[in-house]
A protein has these predicted regions:
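Hydrophobic transmembrane alpha-helices and immediately adjacent juxtamembrane helices
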Residues: 2-162, 166-282
Length: 282
């Protein structure tokens, strides 16, 4: 016998074990996405415009120090060579910063239950956080491009737009996934800072943003080619300049596919961690 409601109807509940929401919880997924987006938009001076200003300073310093007397790299002025790498580097670093803070802040503030209790599957939770991180990366990329465009002598004309879009998204997604993994593992903000300072920052700065690896010793060239950030930055730069130090076109396409595979593997690993509840529910 089912209890009657005030309107004379009946309140019917699904049998135990039968899901009420079938398929993707679109409303919950969108709500999580908007929560994460609004979180970084509330402090957009710090999360979007500050990275643009910092990146512009990088461009000014390195251009003044290394780009004098009309120096050219890959057939273009030094400033135009450095600019694409700075843009995508800022995108990746901010994608990591956004997703690495999502779950960690809940752990530290005791509000992690607000993310775990809603009827969101591990895949939906992961998708919402990663989508917001990529959104911030795109916003930062546009802000950085706008700031860099103010510097004289920089050309941001795109030769291969598909490469700009593909490598920009793959790089942002790569760092967003790594950030989410860090957010699951970290137990305090010091852990997150350690990953940022000792892993993400070195990989970013040693990825060929400010130089071509052909000028390095063969051993360091080999080490650089083991760095996935190198392929993101070189591919992104290829989209603007039509040239890169990665190698022939076959290497470029292999890098594009390789980044997709790497992202898929990392995403599968992070999904498994979320599903197990490791360091979240225990």
């Amino acid at each position: 016998m089912t209890p009657d409601d005030k309107t004379g109807g009946s309140i019917r509940f699904a049998p135990r074990g039968v899901p009420v929401i079938i398929g993707v919880n679109r409303v919950g997924l969108f709500a999580l996405y908007m929560k994460e987006v609004r979180r970084f938009l509330k402090v957009q001076t710090q999360t979007i415009w500050a990275p643009a200003f910092t990146t512009l300073l990088f461009l000014v310093i390195f251009t003044v120090a290394l780009g004098r007397q009309g120096r050219e790299v890959l057939g273009v002025p030094f400033a135009s060579f450095v600019a694409p790498g700075l843009i995508v580097m800022a995108m990746m670093q901010n994608a990591f910063a956004n997703s690495s803070f999502s779950l960690l802040s809940g752990k530290m503030q005791g509000t992690i239950i607000d993310l775990l209790m809603p009827p969101l599957s591990p895949g939906e939770l992961m998708a919402g956080i990663l989508a917001a991180a990529v959104t911030r990366a795109i916003a930062v990329g546009l802000a950085v491009a706008l700031a860099i465009g103010l510097w004289p002598g920089v050309s941001l004309a795109m030769t291969h737009p598909w490469a700009v879009v593909w490598f920009g998204l793959m790089g942002s997604l790569l760092l967003a996934t790594l950030g989410l993994a860090t957010s699951i593992w970290a137990e305090k903000f010091d852990h997150n800072a350690a990953v940022t300072n000792f892993i993400i920052a070195p990989l970013s700065l040693l990825s060929g943003t400010f130089y071509v690896i052909e000028n390095l010793d063969p051993v360091f060239q080999w080490v650089s080619r083991l760095n996935p950030f190198f392929y993101v930055i070189s591919g992104f730069r290829y989209g603007f300049l039509g040239a890169s130090d990665m190698g022939p076109g076959t290497v470029l396409m292999a890098a594009a596919v390789g980044l997709l595979v790497l992202n898929a593997v990392l995403a599968a690993g992070v999904y498994a961690l979320l599903r197990s509840g490791w360091k979240l529910k225990s």
